[in-house]
C-alpha cells in the first residue's frame, strides 16, 4: 500500500480511542492532507498489519503510516502538531 494511512476502528467501547481518531482525522482534514482511513474492525489481517508496521503486538488505533513507513501513534502525532513538524512526522517533507 502506498500513501498516508490512518488505522482506526469503527467498533470500540473506548471513548479515548474514538476521541483520538476524531482528532487525527479532523487535523488532517483541516490541513487538507489526503489519507486513507483503514478500519481494522473489518478484518483481523488489517489489525495484524497495523501492529506489524507499528512494531508493537498490542498497538491500538489510531496509528499512522506512510507507505510502508511507520509514522507513529496519537501521542507522537499530537506532539508533531504542537511542534509544527507534522509534514516531517508524516514523511511528506
UniProtKB/Swiss-Prot annotation:
Domain Glutaredoxin: residue ranges: 2-93
Family classification: Belongs to the SH3BGR family.
Role according to the record: Could act as a modulator of glutaredoxin biological activity. May play a role in cytoskeleton organization.
GO CC, alphabetical: cytosol; nuclear body; ruffle membrane
Positions where N-acetylserine occurs in the chain: 2
CDD domains reported for this sequence: GRX_SH3BGR
Annotated glycan sites: 9
Subunit structure: Homodimer. Interacts with MYO1C (via its IQ motifs); the interaction is dependent on calcium and takes place at membrane ruffles.
Record carries keyword Protein biosynthesis: no
Cell compartment(s), UniProt: Cytoplasm, Cytosol; Cell projection, Ruffle membrane; Nucleus
Post-translational modification: May be glycosylated.
Upper classification of the organism: Eukaryota, Metazoa, Chordata, Craniata, Vertebrata
Record-given protein name: SH3 domain-binding glutamic acid-rich-like protein 3
Entry keyword set: Acetylation, Cell membrane, Cell projection, Cytoplasm, Glycoprotein, Membrane, Nucleus
Superkingdom of origin: Eukaryota
Transmembrane segments: none
InterPro entries the UniProt entry points to: Glut_rich_SH3-bd (IPR006993), SH3BGR (IPR051033), Thioredoxin-like_sf (IPR036249)
BP GO terms, sorted: cytoskeleton organization
Subcellular location, principal: cytoplasm
One Pfam family linked to the record: SH3BGR
Amino acid at each position: 500500500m502506498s500513501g498516508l494511512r490512518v488505522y482506526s476502528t469503527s467498533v470500540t467501547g473506548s471513548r479515548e480511542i474514538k476521541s483520538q481518531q476524531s482528532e487525527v482525522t479532523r487535523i488532517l482534514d483541516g490541513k487538507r492532507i489526503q489519507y486513507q482511513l483503514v478500519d481494522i474492525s473489518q478484518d483481523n489481517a488489517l489489525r495484524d498489519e497495523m501492529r506489524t508496521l507499528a512494531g508493537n503486538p498490542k498497538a491500538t488505533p489510531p496509528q499512522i503510516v506512510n507507505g510502508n513507513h511507520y509514522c507513529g501513534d496519537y501521542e507522537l502525532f499530537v506532539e508533531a502538531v504542537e511542534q509544527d513538524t507534522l509534514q516531517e512526522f508524516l514523511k511528506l517533507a
